[in-house]
From Swiss-Prot:
InterPro entries: ATPase_AAA_core, P-loop_NTPase, RCA-like, RuBisCO_activase_AAA_helical
Disulfide bridges in this chain: none
Subcellular location(s) of the protein: Plastid, Chloroplast stroma
Gene name of the encoded protein: RCAB
Taxonomic lineage: Eukaryota, Viridiplantae, Streptophyta, Embryophyta, Tracheophyta
Gene Ontology molecular function: any one: ribulose-1,5-bisphosphate carboxylase/oxygenase activator activity
Chief site of localization: plastid
Transit peptide stretch: 1-43
UniProt feature coiled coil, ranges: none
The family this protein is said to belong to: Belongs to the RuBisCO activase family.
The protein's name: Ribulose bisphosphate carboxylase/oxygenase activase B, chloroplastic
Length: 425
């Protein structure tokens, strides 16, 4: 009886270990082998020598830029597969720069280059536009930066084109608007301005600089004399631009309100006469005004860009500009286009007047190509005087008054009658 009891309770060695389970088994074998670990913390008798430790460090060179990238390229010339190597002496494989010189080249200070693809940008124009755009993307302490830059001046002086050149040089793709879009259904032009402004703000939100560019604002929102109808849309356009200039980060679309602020978007507008605009819009706090009147150097620089592909010498361009000092810059572009008239006239004579439509609009050969005509200073002077005579005719002959008073052509053909020749002959 006792033996039976002891075999059940005492669990002798003959009992299978599977019966005890895994956890019990581990505890059973390790229960009498517990050890205590004693951790001793001893203070260092002397301070560590940092210099000795650094000298012994195999990675100490990481803290100092002592390598020469160009020489590294040279050393690896015979080791790296030639498939992955550019020819020596080409590009960055010219072994002349050290690593520090590479950094200084990458962080070098760029000069104020005022050309874009060979086209001239007036330094004063470029300075005004770049500073205005940069200020509007900065946080200046206790400074109220005008949101709108108004560029105005005479007709044909290249205001819009100079703006496009500066935008291209800065890598900006602006949201474009025209004054022709500022007249439609009631309230639509003001809504359109807000939509375009929000589109530019979305582009800025995506990490790319942008601005709103409105061409010829005075033609759409201005008042040109007593005969011009001043509509509600004109009022709303002026009021909208004033509101945006006052709160550039809170521009809402009609019918909705978004509490989230939008980025500040600088606005560039061009025009010929800003005195026709609503006076509170053009006050200094809202609009910074810039009168663009190109100097002789600016006109020469732009004209060199106009004739840059025609091999016209610089002294001929200077003479051309000095011969027509009162003309706009656009005059010289029209003058260059006039030189191609002879080539077109010759082509029409070869193909025949009745075949022009078939040849130009729906032809397998495509439009004709011309060899670049030779532009001499004599030919340019001749066409320039022709353009001036046509301008004088428009100013001298007031055909509208003639039509009202008599059925006559006025003095439009007097010059041709006296000389016996018409223009373009």
């Amino acid at each position: 009886m006792a033996s039976a009891f002891s075999s059940t309770v005492g669990a002798p060695a003959s009992t299978p270990t599977i019966f005890l389970g895994k956890k019990v088994k581990n505890y059973y074998h390790g229960g009498n082998k517990m050890k205590s670990r004693v951790v001793r913390v001893m203070a260092a008798k002397k301070e560590l020598d940092q210099g000795k430790q650094t000298d012994a460090d195999r990675w100490k060179g990481l803290a100092y830029d002592i390598s020469d990238d160009q020489q590294d390229i040279t050393r690896g010339k015979g080791i790296v597969d030639s498939l992955f190597q550019a020819p020596m002496g080409d590009g960055t494989h010219e072994a002349i720069l050290s690593s520090y010189e590479y950094i200084s080249q990458g962080l070098r200070k760029y000069d104020f280059d005022n050309t874009m693809d060979g086209l001239y940008i007036a330094p004063a124009f470029m300075d005004k536009l770049i500073v205005h755009l940069a200020k509007n993307f900065m946080t200046l302490p206790n400074i109220k930066v005008p949101l709108i830059l108004g560029i105005w001046g005479g007709k044909g002086q290249g205001k819009s084109f100079q703006c496009e050149l500066v935008f291209a040089k800065m890598g900006i793709n602006p949201i474009m608007m025209s004054a022709g879009e500022l007249e439609s259904g009631n309230g639509e032009p003001a809504k359109l301005i807000r939509q375009r402004y929000r589109e530019a703000a979305d582009i800025i939100n995506k990490g790319k600089m942008c601005c709103l560019f409105i061409n010829d604002l005075d033609a759409g929102a201005g008042r040109m004399g007593g005969t011009t109808q001043y509509t509600v849309n004109n009022q709303m356009v002026n009021a909208t631009l004033m509101n945006i200039a006052d709160a550039p980060t809170n521009v809402q679309l009609p019918g909705m309100y978004n509490k989230e602020e939008n980025p500040r978007v600088p606005i560039i507008v061009t025009g010929n006469d800003f005195s026709t605009l609503y006076a509170p819009l053009i006050r200094d706090g809202r609009m910074e005004k810039f009168y663009w009147a190109p100097t002789r150097e600016d006109r020469i620089g732009v004209c060199k860009g106009i004739f840059r592909t025609d091999n016209v010498p610089d002294e001929a361009v200077v003479r051309l500009v000095d011969t027509f000092p009162g003309q706009s810059i656009d005059f010289f572009g029209a003058l260059r286009a006039r030189v191609y008239d002879d080539e077109v006239r010759k082509w029409v004579g070869e193909i025949g007047v009745e075949n022009i439509s078939k040849r130009l609009v729906n032809s397998r050969e495509g439009p004709p190509t011309f060899d670049q005509p030779k532009m001499t200073i004599e030919k340019l002077m001749e066409y320039g005087h022709m353009l001036v005579q046509e301008q004088e005719n428009v100013k001298r002959v007031q055909l509208a008054d003639k039509y009202l008073s008599e059925a006559a052509l006025g003095q439009a053909n007097d010059d041709a009658m006296k000389t016996g020749a018409f223009y373009g002959k």
